Design a protein with these regions (language model features):
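N-terminal Rossmann-fold NAD(P) dinucleotide-binding loop
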Residues: 14-15
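Conserved N-terminal Rossmann-fold NAD(P) cofactor-binding segment
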Residues: 33-72, 301-309
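Glycine-rich Rossmann-fold phosphate-binding loop(s) that bind the pyrophosphate
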Residues: 10-11
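Rossmann-like NAD(P)-binding element
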Residues: 53-115
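Extreme N-terminal starter segment of soluble prokaryotic enzymes
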Residues: 2-5
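C-terminal substrate-binding/catalytic lobe of Rossmann-fold NAD(P)-dependent dehydrogenases
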Residues: 134-139, 149-309
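Rossmann-like NAD(P)(H) cofactor-binding subdomain of soluble oxidoreductases
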Residues: 88-154
Length: 309
């Protein structure tokens, strides 16, 4: 258990993340901060009132300022707006970049030794904004993408094969978007290569569904997006850090030559421990996987070029 974890943003993702953090007792205090008056306070109070039933002692606090977030060990950033009708991707990008920039400035001042887990979209670019604004080393700025995308991929494979999700080992690398790269060559069912259990056509359909995982949920909900799985993914990362578990999880990390790339955040296998990012693990890729990862990197770099910071 650490002393304090802050969740920035009290929308569906942020509030569900705060609840999961409290229920797992990963910190003595969980602070939920949001610009909308009353929302973080009300949701935090509601969560705290569930403590006697759920059996946790983590104090949940809601606030509109950053004073109570001071000296947080981990800051999970979920703040941002959803794309509105008539809004271009560049408009959305720069609006959310402005929000993340402001949040990052607060984090730099109030919690200068914190580890940041970025959840706001477009994920890989927002992680870059946070790193650039805070000046934090790459060990302390991570993006939550691969854990979520991998969970979706694993759940679809388990469903298709009618086996437990726990027996699916897999990894999805690359950017958090439709160019993500599920690694079929590293996908197994209790050690059995998935290619021995499933035909290529079914696998290809699952890869496509994984890439469109977020959009599929938005289509169903119509006025919202996913939050149960995204919050679970960010909390799994936080848990690995808090308990120094040395978990190997696919996360968006700042590359400095790994996989032949530098100067961007991209989903790669990361060892997470108490210091945050402890190691980027380079795995052998097929030529197609390497090509696809390169295309994914280009898709991440493109919006970085239109950023107005």
């Amino acid at each position: 258990m650490v002393n304090k974890i802050t969740v920035v943003g009290a929308g569906n993702v942020g509030a569900t993340t705060a609840q999961r953090l409290a229920e797992k007792q990963l910190a003595k205090v969980v602070v939920m901060v949001d610009v909308v008056e009353g929302v973080p306070q009300g949701k935090a109070l509601d969560q705290w009132e569930s403590a006697p039933i759920e059996g946790f002692d983590t104090r949940v606090i809601g606030t509109n300022g950053y004073e109570e977030t001071a000296d947080s060990d981990i800051v999970i950033i979920t703040a941002g707006i959803a794309r509105k009708p008539g809004m271009s991707r560049d408009d959305l990008l720069n609006t959310n970049a402005g929000i993340v920039k402001q949040v990052s400035e607060h984090v730099k001042r109030s919690s200068p030794t914190a580890i940041i887990i970025m959840v706001s979209n477009p994920l890989d670019v927002m992680a870059y904004v946070a790193k650039k604004v805070t000046g934090f080393p790459r060990e302390r700025v991570l993006g939550m993408a691969g854990v979520l995308d991998t969970a979706r991929y694993r759940s679809f494979i388990a469903e298709a094969l009618d086996v437990s999700v726990e027996d699916i080992q897999a990894m999805v690398l690359g950017g958090h978007g439709d160019t993500m790269v599920p690694l079929i060559s590293y996908t197994t069912v209790s050690g059995i290569p998935v290619t021995q259990l499933m035909d290529q056509k079914t696998l290809d359909a699952i890869v496509t569904r994984t890439r469109n995982g977020g959009a599929e949920i938005v289509k169903f909900l119509k006025t919202g997006s996913a939050y149960y799985a995204p919050s679970a993914a960010s909390v799994q990362m936080a848990e690995a850090i808090v308990h120094d578990r040395k978990r190997v999880l696919p996360c968006a990390a700042w590359l400095e030559g790994e996989y032949g790339m530098s100067g961007l955040f991209l989903g790669v296998p990361c060892k997470l421990g108490r210091k945050g990012l402890e190691q980027i693990i380079e795995v052998e890729l097929t030529s197609k996987e390497r090509t696809d990862l390169g295309k994914s990197a280009e898709a991440v770099r493109e919006p970085m070029s239109v950023l107005k910071l």
